[in-house]
Amino acid sequence: MVLLYSQASWDKRSKADALVLPFWMKNSKAQEAAVVDEDYKLVYQNALSNFSGKKGETAFLFGNDHTKEQKIVLLGLGKSEEVSGTTVLEAYAQATTVLRKAKCKTVNILLPTISQLRFSVEEFLTNLAAGVLSLNYNYPTYHKVDTSLPFLEKVTVVGIVSKVGDKIFRKEESLFEGVYLTRDLVNTNADEVTPEKLAAVAKGLAGEFASLDVKILDRKAILKEKMGLLAAVAKGAAVEPRFIVLDYQGNPKSKDRTVLIGKGVTFDSGGLDLKPGKAMITMKEDMAGAATVLGIFSALASLELPINVTGIIPATENAIGSAAYKMGDVYVGMTGLSVEIGSTDAEGRLILADAISYALKYCNPTRIIDFATLTGAMVVSLGESVAGFFANNDVLARDLAEASSETGEALWRMPLVEKYDPALHSDIADMKNIGSNRAGSITAALFLQRFLEDNPVAWAHLDIAGTAYHEKEELPYPKYATGFGVRCLIHYMEKFLSK
């Protein structure tokens, strides 16, 4: 879906289906955040008795014969002194939902007086564009009759005429092509999004962008590389596993390389340690880490960032069956480290472990960042609005946190408590794949950290179990797959690595 973007002054704007008018909240009452004609004030003045201008508040009104737009949306931005990028992002996401429900296809968005805010026009426009694009999206459905909302087709920002506005919107569109790819993959039936499908998507990206190369390992090649942990998880599945390696060379003269790893469990039944039905019903989303990496590569190649990045996706189902891997058995990873299986439902860390080992052997990484819907414990800890992350490097952790703050994709650093590491002890192997029934997210991260062995590489593990998929709309995300992480990581790489 291509969303047309333009800019105009108030007097020279074209007709549109709707106009979005901004308001501050002052002393619990709505205050105009921009100057408009008296004809518009006549439309909304009576509505202000029930509209306070608080963050994300909207009121839907109809215009009259004297207004260019026949539908008017009042949008609250909250107190002007408290407005943040996240405020703007969520407010315009909410406005987009209102506009689409009203079947608007063209919209004029009047900017507030930005001089009253603590940040720049560029920052405001970036978050406005992200808010609109985030909810100008329909998840795949399977109804006989299409019930999805119509898309916005044209947005005109009123009150500024500048080259920077068009540049910002084009950049955000490239970013959201990656976000939409991530969402679509997570939202689509698990029977369709198999490991082979993920491999096909990676091949498609490499075909679209000359800057991308792809390498696909099948089961035979996986076994040849001695990835015994990935091979173990794949044993019970009717679909074949794939190990996907994407390579982006944006700066051939640099030795700096970021490796992004995404957990690609295309459906997680729990294996022989079978999940209850209620816990299994959303498990097509267990490949959200893989989808995030693919979305990042789509945006990365489109934006042509001058950095070097490798993406690794270990992809398999975790199925129940007579050949499925078994609890109590021991399997050996790529580097020879052995793992006793305490639970077949702790499979994500196994396939990530082989991916980390592969990255260290072949990619010479400066840093490794992995994405995984890894633990229910993280959802219990931080809910669905914040992803927990672990890092062995303070600079990497600081930079990720800053990128998180600036994009509104909330990350919270969690501790790597070495005191908990003995919980992974096994009498018959180098380690177990689960700890005790406490600190589950931490022991999962400690498990992954062991596969770094003595390598000093900077590493971060993002547990996106809560943030990747929402069963109800939560601004600025739609219902179901969110695409969380794509914008944050692109911003991180652009700000801190593109030098």
UniProtKB/Swiss-Prot annotation:
HAMAP family: Cytosol_peptidase_M17 (MF_00181). This is Probable cytosol aminopeptidase. Presumably involved in the processing and regular turnover of intracellular proteins. Catalyzes the removal of unsubstituted N-terminal amino acids from various peptides. Mn(2+) 2 binds at residues 263, 268, 286, 347. Mn(2+) 1 binds at residues 268, 345, 347. InterPro entries: Leucine_aapep/pepB, Macro_dom-like, Peptidase_M17_C, Peptidase_M17_leu_NH2_pept, Peptidase_M17_N. GO terms for molecular function: manganese ion binding; metalloaminopeptidase activity. Binds 2 manganese ions per subunit. The active site is at 275, 349. It catalyses: Release of an N-terminal amino acid, Xaa-|-Yaa-, in which Xaa is preferably Leu, but may be other amino acids including Pro although not Arg or Lys, and Yaa may be Pro. Amino acid amides and methyl esters are also readily hydrolyzed, but rates on arylamides are exceedingly low; Release of an N-terminal amino acid, preferentially leucine, but not glutamic or aspartic acids. It is an enzyme of class 3 (hydrolase). Keywords: Aminopeptidase, Cytoplasm, Hydrolase, Manganese, Metal-binding, Protease. It comes from Chlamydia trachomatis serovar A (strain ATCC VR-571B / DSM 19440 / HAR-13). Its EC number is 3.4.11.1, 3.4.11.10. Transmembrane segments: none annotated. It is found in: Cytoplasm. GO terms for biological process: proteolysis.
